[in-house]
UniProtKB/Swiss-Prot annotation:
Pathway: Amino-acid biosynthesis; L-methionine biosynthesis via salvage pathway; L-methionine from S-methyl-5-thio-alpha-D-ribose 1-phosphate: step 3/6. The active site is at K99. Belongs to the RuBisCO large chain family. Type IV subfamily. This is 2,3-diketo-5-methylthiopentyl-1-phosphate enolase. It comes from the Bacteria. The gene is mtnW. It comes from Bacillus cereus (strain ZK / E33L). It catalyses: 5-methylsulfanyl-2,3-dioxopentyl phosphate = 2-hydroxy-5-methylsulfanyl-3-oxopent-1-enyl phosphate. NCBIfam families: PRK09549.1, salvage_mtnW. The modification N6-carboxylysine is found at K174. InterPro entries: Diketo-Methiopentyl-P_enolase (IPR017717), RuBisCO (IPR033966), RuBisCO_lsu_C (IPR000685), RuBisCO_lsu_C_sf (IPR036376), RuBisCO_lsu_fd_N (IPR017443), RuBisCO_lsu_N_sf (IPR036422). Its EC number is 5.3.2.5. Substrate binds at K148, K174, D175, D176, E177, H265, G338, G360, G361. GO terms for molecular function: 2,3-diketo-5-methylthiopentyl-1-phosphate enolase activity; magnesium ion binding; ribulose-bisphosphate carboxylase activity.
Length: 414
């Protein structure tokens, strides 16, 4: 294979999957075949999309009812020649799913890149090992928390929140994705003030915390804003990838003047991936493509919390982020939304140690504040790694958290 293989889930009311697959392969490449003169067929043969797999799936009555018609479900795979597109994500996505995304019940499930094509993508700059080296934490999951309620608040409020989270043992504190450039907490002031707080906590408590600052603005201003953040001392850049595009992420990741990790937020991605019938699969969008484009971290809905993703999908995202690939470093999985300490055993059981446990209300909503919330999570992480049930741990902060949010992992064993 020298190009790319696209895998689709299709629902076809013509009930002829082979014909539908061939129509897609031709429609996204040379447009027609059977009516072309033989000489022209020979000339265009190297540009033709090739159907390499057609598999019929069991009928879904629920799907038929939803669509109000009877359809045949199937998985098809089509190989697109590298000659047809430039080696960049806009060209690849337009080739494999451009106008097809408008053509009925078709979902892009996966893209398989040839080795030659992979070489055109940067992958994570730091990856899991690089992030762990920055923190000098190698034996446990990382703990991340989120600034909450920052809109309309000043730098003093930010510093207080940041200090409490760092003292609580949090490894990374990130901006809320809806915190943009503003007069009260401008980008560089957040970074400079935040670094002062984190340095003070490190000197006093010996715990290192990194700050992920939200880089925002108009697309053509992003690089300059990112470089300003780096010059001010930013540890990590949080980026709302899908409000801008994967290629914008790649351009940031490839820039040598932006030598910091990038954390990809999934905001807007639901518009692409939420449907079971249309769009792009979550594992491809939030896993493989983010990793290829340069994300060191990928946030996505966990299978447990308030914005739950199906467990199979969440694990598939993580697989794409962390599977061995000689071309790319591994990215951190960050299952998120509604996470509290009682979920820690589930997260470690399902995602392993190389995961970032991300909490907002589960830290800030603790009766002992963010310090108590952070400590409750750290205790839950340590207990889980020792295979000790959380309800048996004698720790006031963890006990308080379990009383508030419950202990659904009561019987979980690693």
């Amino acid at each position: 294979m020298s190009g790319i293989i696209a895998t689709y889930l299709i629902h076809d009311d013509s009930h002829n999957l082979e014909k539908k697959a061939e129509q897609i392969a031709l429609g996204l490449t040379i447009g027609s075949w059977t009516h072309l003169p033989h000489l022209l067929q020979e000339q265009l043969k190297q540009h033709k999309g090739n159907v390499i797999h057609v598999e019929e799936l069991a009928e879904h009555e629920h799907t038929n009812s939803y669509l109000r018609k009877k359809v045949k479900r199937g998985i098809i795979k089509i190989e697109y020649p590298l000659l047809n597109f430039s080696p960049d994500l806009p060209a690849i996505l337009t080739t494999t799913f451009g106008k097809l995304s408008l053509d009925g019940e078709v979902k892009l499930i996966d893209l398989t890149f040839s080795d030659g094509l992979k070489k055109h993508f940067p992958g994570p700059k730091f990856g899991i090992d690089g992030i762990r080296n920055l923190l000098q934490v190698h034996d446990r999951p990382l703990l991340m928390s989120i600034f909450k309620g920052m809109i309309g608040r000043n730098i003093g409020y930010l510093k207080t929140q940041l200090r409490d989270q760092a003292i609580g043992g949090v490894d990374i504190v990130k901006d809320d994705e809806i915190l943009f450039e503003n007069a009260l907490t401008p980008l560089t002031k957040r970074i400079v003030s935040g670094k002062e707080v984190l340095q003070s906590v490190y000197e006093t408590y010996g715990h290192k915390t990194l700050y992920a600052v939200n880089v925002t603005g108009r697309t053509f201003d992003l690089k300059e804003n990112a470089k300003r953040a780096v010059q001010a001392g930013a540890d990590i850049l949080l980026f709302n990838v899908f409000a801008y595009g994967l290629d914008v992420l790649q351009s940031l990741a490839e820039d040598d003047e932006i030598p910091v990790p990038i954390m990809a937020h999934p905001a807007v991605s639901g518009a692409y991936s939420a449907s079971k019938l249309y769009g792009i699969s979550s594992p491809l969008l939030l896993g493989k493509l983010l990793r290829y484009a340069g994300a060191d971290f990928s946030l996505f809905p966990s299978p447990y919390g308030s914005v739950a993703l199906e467990k199979e999908e969440a694990l598939a995202i993580s697989k794409y982020l962390t599977e061995d690939d000689v071309f790319f470093k591994k990215s951190f999985s960050v299952p998120s939304a509604g996470i509290h300490p009682g979920f820690v055993p589930f997260i470690i059981r399902d995602f392993g140690k190389d995961v970032v446990i991300n909490a907002g209300g589960g830290i800030h909503g603790h009766p002992n504040g963010a310090q108590g919330g952070g400590k409750a999570f750290r205790t839950a992480i340590d207990a889980t790694l020792q295979n000790k049930p959380l309800h048996e741990v004698d720790d006031i902060n963890l006990h308080s958290a379990l009383q508030i949010w419950g202990n659904p992992s009561h019987e979980v064993k690693l």
